[in-house]
Amino acid sequence: MAFKGEHRAILIANILIVVAISIFSSGFFPYKSLLPGLATFAETNIGTVAPKVFDRVIFMVIDALRSDFVYSKTSGFSFTQSLIRSGAALPFTAHASSPTVTMPRLKAMTTGSVPSFLDVILNIAESDTSSTLAYQDTWLAQIKAQGGQLVMYGDDTWIKLFPGVFDRCDGTTSFFVSDFTEVDHNVTRHVPRELSERDWSAFIMHFLGLDHIGHKAGPKSRHMMTKQREMDSIVALIYAAMEEQEHLQSTLFVLCGDHGMNDAGNHGGSSPGEISPALLFISPKFQTKTTPEDSPVEAFSDLQYYRTVEQVDITPTLAGLLGLPIPLNSLGVFIPEFLMMWDNDAHRIDILLRNAKQMLSAMKGTFPDLDVEAITPPHGCDKHVLRSAQDVMSSTASKYNTTRLYLGLFVAALAVLLSFFPAYGLGSKYSYAVTFLMLIIISYGGMMFASSYVEEEQQFWYWVVTAWTVYLHIKSLRPWHGSKDTRRWNQTGQKFAAEPDIARDFFPRHQNILWALIILTYFDTCMHLCLNSHSSNIWRSAAILTTIAAFFFKLVFVASDSPELLYESLLSPIQKSLEEMPLVPPARLSKAVNIPIFLMFRLQAIILDFLKMSAIEVTLTSLLSQNMTFFAFGGSNAISSVDLSNAYNGIGSYSVVLVGVLTFISNWAGPIWWASAARLLYSNPTFAERYGQRTLLTFHAATSLMSVMAACTMLRTHLFIWTVFSPKYLYTLAWTILNHMFINLPATANVSQVLNWQYAFHSVACR
């Protein structure tokens, strides 16, 4: 009876884990309150209103346009740089606050407000409409309110954000990262026609190809310079039309990136590369008003060129230049370099006062009991005062529901309590393993309260796995090699991400070793399939043909997208033939350098199989290896480390479910492999042993979740809450719900020989 009671306790604990996540998330990621309606012009007591400088705007967004892509000596934007030198373009580096993904960045540029971190999740859901801006005040809504027409071509995130707003539009799917060319051609083909049209007030373009190249091959890809020159040619086309066509004479051209990218080509975090997109305001009118800048130039700090402005400053600046009211919820400050567009000092003061009054209104909405007038100095429109108000408002942009935070934390604590006593009961039989797990949990829980440890979590798991292997070595007197090599396979985290590693530095210089390991990995997979298949020759032939097809598939992909891995190898004579083979483009998206790591896993599993470990020791070994291999594959606690390059294998069109599943499988390939391996390392556990495995897994999941929740609650006002702790919480959700609930727990069930095939096929399917 006591055993059945403990079994129910584990079941209830897993249910409580889901409940705790639901409650805590609703309090941690709320939608912030916004002022309703549209802004109108307010009196400024100046007696004169600043006239608009431009009649229409061309707003060109190049996804992931990092500042150095435009301003550095290695840039492909030669024409754009000539505009800077002539004074026709005013260059800036925009500061894109985290999260650096498209949807929240577009919200910042159109509303002038700081988006919710929940937009990171909504950004992935292609069909999501809950994050619409149709009823919020934006500079697009202000143009529409004045009778203007809007046209948009490119990333369909705009159509999601502004349903029914555009008079003409053609959206492209933003997450189909295999497409470098057609996704931009579908925008470019509309440009000449729209430039000749006279009916629009705002022409918006959003190009995705450069971002897709970054996700696939990084900022140093051989495709990057070609794409930059292509985008530069579009800038030249638009500027020529602005000079030649009469109806475009009073047009403002804005060229910007929504965010940047890191050295791996990803984004979502807060590294200098991710938060530093380029921003340029272009018009022939600027040539008579400004002093030209040099271009190209050197960055004066990490990717900071010229002057840095906040991305939300785009909104009030556009409003002032186009003669629009500043949107109600804007936290932006008018960029002072554009005050020179008004010769009358009264007009300049009018612009600043309207900005100050709008900021005052926003502050009253956030702090209704605050007497702002009493603490505002007479020079209230001064840019330093506005910047201070901007900083305060940005820091309070998201209000937590503390009741739900504490309630969710309490429910998580109940789950820990329910699983603790059954786990503690296992200590009498498996004292060393359970004690080791308890020490890990205590150390891990304390580590979650330090941002540096969260950023470098991989170091913790590398040391933990090493310590556990020492114990297994002493216990069995058999060595377990490979953990050091696995650690060096992909450098990750924040401090050591750019350090040399095996995948990016060793293999490109030793290509024959790489391909020998790849071939050996596929051979081992083939042998395992044959040995675990039916005795029928048909099954064995199918296993052999499948493995051969998978290898040549991979070979063709590498020849197409990473030919540098073939140039000096023994396979180079057939490279030209491989490049000409037609394949489905979405399938060209996997990393060959990670294939040999599966062979290392296999060798480690063979050694472990000789150790005759108990069911609990196998579970703990699998659990530790899962966490270690997640980082060994290049994962981290930053949103930018999510690898989308494998999310489209075999898919011809976007599907949020299929892409989501493939994204999880590709990023958790190592943990899934070790969850499957655990079943084979202890293939016939008793019911009591399976219960013990589920107990340890549940206890670890519950304590990890509670630790992260506690850290996020106590440190919710921390400087790094949105750049370190919130991403960590999102990763914890993936570990708890997807990996624990759908991978680890089912792996402890009493399943049949199917798992043997799952274990063997995984090396092929996940690549």
From Swiss-Prot:
Keyword Amino-acid biosynthesis: no
Glycosylation sites recorded in the entry for this protein: N186, N401, N490, N627
One Gene Ontology cellular component annotation held by this UniProt entry: plasma membrane
Cross-referenced InterPro entries: Alkaline_phosphatase_core_sf (IPR017850), Phosphodiest/P_Trfase (IPR002591), PIG-G_N (IPR037674), PIGG/GPI7 (IPR039527), PIGG/GPI7_C (IPR045687)
One biological process term in Gene Ontology: GPI anchor biosynthetic process
Membrane topology term: Multi-pass membrane protein
Pathway: Glycolipid biosynthesis; glycosylphosphatidylinositol-anchor biosynthesis
EC number(s) from the headed UniProt entry: 2.-.-.-
Disulfide bonds: none
GO molecular function: CP2 mannose-ethanolamine phosphotransferase activity
Subcellular location: Endoplasmic reticulum membrane
Keywords: Endoplasmic reticulum, Glycoprotein, GPI-anchor biosynthesis, Membrane, Transferase, Transmembrane, Transmembrane helix
Pfam family, one: Phosphodiest
Function: Ethanolamine phosphate transferase involved in glycosylphosphatidylinositol-anchor biosynthesis. Transfers ethanolamine phosphate to the GPI second mannose.
Family that this chain belongs to: Belongs to the PIGG/PIGN/PIGO family. PIGG subfamily.
Name by which UniProt lists this protein: GPI ethanolamine phosphate transferase 2
